[in-house]
Every structure is written in C-alpha cells, then in structure tokens.
C-alpha cells in the first residue's frame, strides 16, 4: 500500500475517544504548518527525512523514527527540512478520555520520543491508516476507535511515565480528590480521618502531600471553604445565623460565630450589618 499523501477526516463526536482524522504526507522542502492552535491531539510518526517542531517557544530537531505530539490548545509550528524534507503519518483524535490517557505517557509532557518501524506503536498507527481502504460505515468507525485504544496502549507501554512523574501525577490526583470531597461535604461533620480512609491513605501521608500542594493543612482548607461559604450566605438577610451555621458544618452557632470572628476579625452579625450598610 502506498501510504503517502492520504487524508481522511471524520465527524464522530459521540465517543469518549474518537478518531478525527488520519493521513500521510511526503512534504516538499521547507513545507511548514502553523503557528496554529488545535482543538484535538495529533500524533505524528516520521518515516524519513528531517524537520523542526516549535512548541512553547522551544524548537526541536526531529528525524526519521521520531514521534511527536501536537497537543490540544497549545500553539505549534512545524517545518520540513530544506535539504531532506520529512514524510510522516499522523492520527488526530479527541474525546473526554483523550487527555487522561495521554497523561499516562511521557510523550504528553515531552512532546516527542524516538521509536522505530519495528515498534508496536508504528504497527498500530499503520493499522489505523489502512482504514483508508475500507468503506466508512458505523461498524468500521467502532473498529477504528478500538484500534485507537490499542495505539494509545502501545504508546503508554513504550513510553510510560517515569516513576517520579507517575508519583507526582498520583499526588496531584489525591489532592484534587480531597478538595472534591471537602467541597461536596463541608456542610456535614467532616473529619480528616474519614477522608483518609475513603482514599485508603494514611492520615500522615495525606497531610504531607496536601500541605505541600496547598500550603494549608486539610483542617485549614475545610475551615477556609466553610468560612467563604458562610460569608456568601450572610449576604442573604433571610437566613439566620443558626441556619448558616448548620449549612456550613457547625452544629453549634456559638462555635461558628467564634470561628468566623477568628477567621475574619469580626462577628457574623457585624459582617452582615456592614454589608447592609453598604
């Protein structure tokens, strides 16, 4: 099969992951594309020749066997070499799961990796490109999405995150989960031990990673969320102090008033009067 100068585009937007377009091209000398910002992800595999990729104001020299990623929502520019212009194949894809899957590979942050035609990754890209020979049916669209999952699995297998990157990624995920729990349950009796058990982590480890990320302890963050919410609720004159106290996780309105005064330097009643006077 002649893989050069193929382009197919699809309008499939009902999947967690979908193939938007794929193709191959033998570029003319100095051929360039961009700078442009795209709304999907595109993986290129360089078959032969050389070229340059500029991303985040940093230019990479790339050659045959290299893979490069054009990320979503970031300006990119790429250009074929003047003497040895490159040829490449590419797969463009999108979907709600695309970013989280890509983040499991070092390609997501580095934007390029070196592979080869003997790799599973190249073989899987070629499998998708060869759909150019098949009619566009709903069955083939589903098959193509299945092959895209296999491609991304091969990418993660060949270029996984380093242990440090994986650790940092997991830490960020835990911190975000803690924040999500707090924002959804600040109105109840929320304890740090309960959050740690829910995430199957030790309290000391959770405290350490959360404080490192936010400069706050989990208790301090819970209080911050409760105080900011109570500040908003106090703007409604129809709500009593007791009602507001209960809504932000305090069963005792006196304890709430004390916490509010310690946090803002004034009582809830005084804060409300100042709002009404303004």
Swiss-Prot record:
Bridged cysteine pairs (disulfide): none
Superkingdom per UniProt: Bacteria
Q: What InterPro entries does the entry give?
A: AraC-bd, Homeodomain-like_sf, HTH-like, HTH_AraC, HTH_AraC-typ_CS, Tscrpt_reg_AraC-type_HTH
What keywords appear on the UniProt entry? Activator, DNA-binding, Transcription, Transcription regulation
Q: Where is the HTH araC/xylS-type domain?
A: 176-274
User: Which ranges does the entry annotate as DNA-binding region?
Assistant: 193-214, 241-264
Database matches in Pfam families: AraC_binding, HTH_18
MF annotations from Gene Ontology: DNA-binding transcription factor activity; sequence-specific DNA binding
According to its UniProt entry, the function of this protein is described as: Regulatory protein for the msm operon for multiple sugar metabolism. Activates the transcription of the msmEFGK, aga, dexB and gftA genes.
What name is this protein filed under? Answer: Msm operon regulatory protein
* Organism name: Streptococcus mutans serotype c (strain ATCC 700610 / UA159)
Which lineage ranks, top first, belong to the organism behind this chain? Bacteria, Bacillati, Bacillota, Bacilli, Lactobacillales
Task: Identify the gene encoding this protein.
Answer: msmR
């Amino acid at each position: 099969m002649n893989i050069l100068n193929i382009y197919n585009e699809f309008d499939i937007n009902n999947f967690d992951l979908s193939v938007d377009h794929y193709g191959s091209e033998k570029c003319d000398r100095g051929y360039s594309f961009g700078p442009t910002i795209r709304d999907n992800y595109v993986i290129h595999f360089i078959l032969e020749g050389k070229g340059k990729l500029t991303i985040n104001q940093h230019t990479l020299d790339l050659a045959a066997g290299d893979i490069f990623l054009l990320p979503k929502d970031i300006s990119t520019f790429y250009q074929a070499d003047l003497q040895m212009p490159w040829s490449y194949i590419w797969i463009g894809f999108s979907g709600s799961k695309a970013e989280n899957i890509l983040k499991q590979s070092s390609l997501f942050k580095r934007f390029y990796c070196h592979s080869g035609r003997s790799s599973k990754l190249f073989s899987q890209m070629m499998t998708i490109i060869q759909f150019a020979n098949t009619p566009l049916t709903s069955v083939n669209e589903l098959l193509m999405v299945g092959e895209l999952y296999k491609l991304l699995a091969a990418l993660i297998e060949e270029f996984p995150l380093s242990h440090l990157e994986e650790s940092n990624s997991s830490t960020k995920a835990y911190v975000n989960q803690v924040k999500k729990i707090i924002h959804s349950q600040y109105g109840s009796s929320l304890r740090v031990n309960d959050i740690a058990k829910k995430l199957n982590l030790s309290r000391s480890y959770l405290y350490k990673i959360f404080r490192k990320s936010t400069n706050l302890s989990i208790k301090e963050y819970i209080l911050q969320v409760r105080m900011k919410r109570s500040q908003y609720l106090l703007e409604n004159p129809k709500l009593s102090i007791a009602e507001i106290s209960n809504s932000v996780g305090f069963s005792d309105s006196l304890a709430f008033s004390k916490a509010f005064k310690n946090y803002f330097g004034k009582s809830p009643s005084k804060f409300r009067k100042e709002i009404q006077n303004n």
